[in-house]
């Protein structure tokens, strides 16, 4: 790691920290405010990959993972008040799901980007982010809320997330967590397209000696 990599590490740390805070605040029926900041992690990873290469990009990913673990450890100690009961802000399943989803999705993003880096400028960031975002969403929501994985944390009642309701209020019935997952996924896909604009602008301004082939 060099001093030139520090902005990427700090940006990733800030995004992970902000997302862990904002996920506590709802936005509408299906989302939290964290859904709008978390996808920026893919932008940071892709910028580091394009400018410095896959090695520094992975270092940024590991830095973000460490910050995420730290946030989860703090969250498990913060108790919130429910209707006559208390519960941790971050359950074990959420902690495992978020950490595993982040690390797996980001490393896959780095690998796909590096494989496609010689093609059209937008193909590598778009394809890697779409695959990474899909994997991230599937892993997190399944691990955190699926009734089939209650053995991970038997004391954690996820019955609320498995309530059968019309999918996104308009489709056939499905567990609530699936609607939450798809809503989150659609935000990620939308931001993946929007992020191409700052990606192009930042890469074009990078010093020639910084750019990786």
Placement of each model-derived feature along the sequence:
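Hydrophobic transmembrane alpha-helices
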Residues: 1-62
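Structural signature of hydrophobic alpha-helical transmembrane segments
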Residues: 29-40, 89-101
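A generic, lipid-embedded transmembrane alpha helix
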Residues: 46, 67-77
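Helix-adjacent hinge/juxtasegments
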Residues: 73-97
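Membrane-embedded alpha-helical hairpins and interfacial helices in multi-pass inner-membrane proteins
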Residues: 92-211
């Amino acid at each position: 790691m060099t001093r030139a990599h520090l902005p990427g590490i700090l940006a990733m740390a800030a995004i992970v920290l902000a997302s862990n805070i904002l996920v506590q605040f709802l936005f509408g029926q299906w989302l939290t405010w964290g859904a709008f900041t978390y996808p920026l992690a893919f932008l940071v990873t892709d910028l580091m990959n394009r400018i410095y290469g896959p090695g520094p990009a992975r270092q940024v990913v590991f830095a973000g993972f460490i910050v995420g673990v730290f946030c989860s450890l703090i969250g498990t100690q913060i108790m919130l008040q429910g209707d006559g009961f208390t519960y941790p802000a971050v359950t074990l399943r959420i902690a495992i799901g978020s950490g595993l989803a982040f690390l797996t999705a980001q490393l896959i993003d780095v690998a796909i980007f590096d494989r496609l880096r010689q093609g059209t400028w937008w193909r590598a960031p778009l394809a890697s982010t779409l695959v990474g975002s899909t994997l991230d969403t599937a892993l997190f929501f399944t691990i955190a809320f699926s009734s089939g994985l209650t053995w991970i944390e038997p004391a954690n009642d996820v019955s609320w997330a498995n309530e059968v309701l019309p999918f996104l209020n308009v489709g056939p019935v499905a567990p609530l967590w699936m609607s939450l997952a798809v809503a989150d996924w659609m935000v990620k896909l939308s931001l993946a397209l929007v992020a191409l604009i700052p990606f192009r602008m930042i890469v074009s301004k990078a010093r020639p000696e910084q750019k990786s082939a």
